């Protein structure tokens, strides 16, 4: 009898925290407003349309109003790496990047496939999303598997042969994933605001950390 044993699996951490949405949106509203102000000239050149113009904030991880949320995400990220089997007793997790962004109401918002180099964890927390919003897409991180991939029986099913997957998060969904996974966002059409926080975390050796 044939038995399947799974090795080299890729974990994705998912948690629903809808109680975070309203308080975090309240903190993030001014950041998005400021980002849209910076985009005014681009929108003006497009005759008032924000098609393809993403409102992208400056770093927000140090905002005191977000402290408890940032700490929670940092703790879960450490636990995520620990559960993967990494020895982190001499490491601490540090946010290298954290920002909020909102895709344009007129559509065209997207992210091409990419990774964030020199990080160990990437993640998202969704603040506004409806059924027509862009979809987050993750790609198979195994280059050798992609090089010799055979045709899939069905692109509709998630199988061992899948080269990419997507999901439909809700406002309040927290995603934590290994930073080596290539990810993207599909092109969105005209829709209600699609807003999320994107963050990247590096596990740094404690001996390199500045003592307080």
Task: Label each PLM-derived region with a short phrase.
Residues 122-125, 176, 191-207:
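A short hydrophobic beta-strand segment most commonly corresponding to one strand
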Residues 26, 188, 208-211:
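Short conserved micro-motifs at the rims of enzyme active sites and ligand-binding pockets
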């Amino acid at each position: 009898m044939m038995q399947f044993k799974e090795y080299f699996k890729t974990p994705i951490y998912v948690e629903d925290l809808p109680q975070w949405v309203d308080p975090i949106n309240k903190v993030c509203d001014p950041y998005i407003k400021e980002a849209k102000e910076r985009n005014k000239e681009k929108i003006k050149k497009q005759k008032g349309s924000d098609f393809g113009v993403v409102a992208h904030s400056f770093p927000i991880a140090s905002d005191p109003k977000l402290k408890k949320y940032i700490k929670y995400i940092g703790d879960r990220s450490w636990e995520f790496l620990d559960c993967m089997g990494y020895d982190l007793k001499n490491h601490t997790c540090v946010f290298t990047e954290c920002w909020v962004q909102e895709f344009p109401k007129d559509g065209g918002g997207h992210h091409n496939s990419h990774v964030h180099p020199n990080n160990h964890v990437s993640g998202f927390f969704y603040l506004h999303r409806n059924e027509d919003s862009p979809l987050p897409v993750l790609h198979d991180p195994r280059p050798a598997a992609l090089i010799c991939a055979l045709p899939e029986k069905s692109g509709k099913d998630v199988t061992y042969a899948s080269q990419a997957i997507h999901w439909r998060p809700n406002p309040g969904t927290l995603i934590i994933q290994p930073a080596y996974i290539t990810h993207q966002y599909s092109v969105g059409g005209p829709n209600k605001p699609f807003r999320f926080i994107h963050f990247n975390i590096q596990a740094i050796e404690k001996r390199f950390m500045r003592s307080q």
